[in-house]
Regions:
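Catalytic machinery of carbohydrate-active enzymes
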Residues: 1-317
Length: 317
């Protein structure tokens, strides 16, 4: 069976789709999946063995210069690649107008998606041939698993979903024990105060456990350097690709993170993780997987380093 999956962004949403692929692969012999995904995240679907081809889309970049020659040529190439195959099923796991209009409607095959009451943008359901009522009152991973099971006609198993990518990143080398702190995210209100990060780093390094600080842009690099200054057993990592970052996560003792896509990557790699949430409720969209822990408060500033260390110490002993 050849299936086209539409899930273009964001990092967390793409990662949330992986357990559904595992379900489908185990239920359907010879399953082959092509995946339409934003170019910045194209590396992630490659990690799953069910995915045979990536169809990159660049809506975020194209909309900045929609009438340029480059955009027109890239759109033509994208559309040609998307329409090169006849699919047994086209599944829009995004459920947005942009995914339905720019991807689902163009793909060849019976189009499956959420019904109008099951998605944030009901207009998207107009582009689907088959529509499914799937409750919002469950984690996003479970919604996607149910969508795939109904679209591809297999019984959904009761076990917790399996991302099935961690084994690709585990190292057999002897490594000094370390933890990773994902200290940066896109929205200011989701950041944890830097003095709390510093206090936590001091507590962890006192146990002879190294702390590694990744970053993705210059602002995040500067923050990492501020957190590390004057402290021993702290490493500001170099700029890493997603694959390299996944290797770092997979071989860590544990992770502490703010609300970021990299927290979901940590969950997908079956790594113990403490995610810090302020006003955001993690029940339906938080990290999904084994050994995932949350600390919540009405404001990030109300979560203390003592609270985090108490939880983390149990994970790194």
């Amino acid at each position: 069976m050849k299936v086209c999956v539409i899930k273009t962004s964001s990092m967390g949403d793409i990662i949330h789709t992986l357990p559904a692929l595992t379900d489908a692969q185990r239920a359907i012999p010879n399953l082959s999946i092509d995946w339409v995904v934003e170019e910045n995240f194209a590396e992630i679907p490659h990690w799953h063995s069910a995915v045979k081809q990536i169809i990159p889309i660049a809506l975020r970049r194209w909309r900045k210069s929609p009438f340029s020659a480059q955009t027109k040529n890239e759109w033509k190439s994208y559309r040609s690649l998307l329409q090169a195959n006849q699919y047994d099923a086209v599944i829009d796991a995004q459920g947005l107008f942009k995914s339905a209009f720019f991807a689902t409607r163009l793909a060849n095959g019976i189009k499956h998606g959420y019904d109008r009451k099951s998605i944030r943008e009901p207009i998207a359901s107009l582009f689907y041939d088959k529509k499914y009522a799937i409750s919002y009152q469950q984690h996003a991973v479970e919604r996607i698993r149910q969508l795939f099971a109904q679209a591809l006609s297999y019984p959904l198993q009761k076990e917790k979903g399996d991302y099935d990518i961690a084994r690709h990143f585990i190292s057999t080398d002897s490594i000094e024990p370390y933890v990773i702190f994902f200290h940066s995210t896109t929205r200011d209100e989701k950041h944890w105060p830097e003095h709390e990060w510093r206090n936590l780093i001091e507590k962890v390094t006192a146990l002879s456990v190294q702390v590694r600080l990744p970053w993705g842009n210059e602002k995040e690099k500067t923050r990492a350097e501020r957190l590390a200054v004057g402290l021993s057993h702290v490493v500001v990592l170099p700029k890493l690709s997603l694959h390299e970052l996944a290797e770092q996560i997979a071989n860590a003792k544990a992770v502490v993170s703010v609300d970021t896509g990299l927290a979901h990557l940590t969950a997908a790699l079956d790594k113990p993780n403490i995610t810090l949430y302020g006003a955001t409720a993690p029940t339906l969209i938080g990290c999904y997987g084994q050994n995932q822990h949350y600390l919540t408060a009405n404001s990030m500033g109300n979560i203390t380093s003592d609270q985090v260390f108490s939880e983390l110490n149990l994970l790194i002993k």
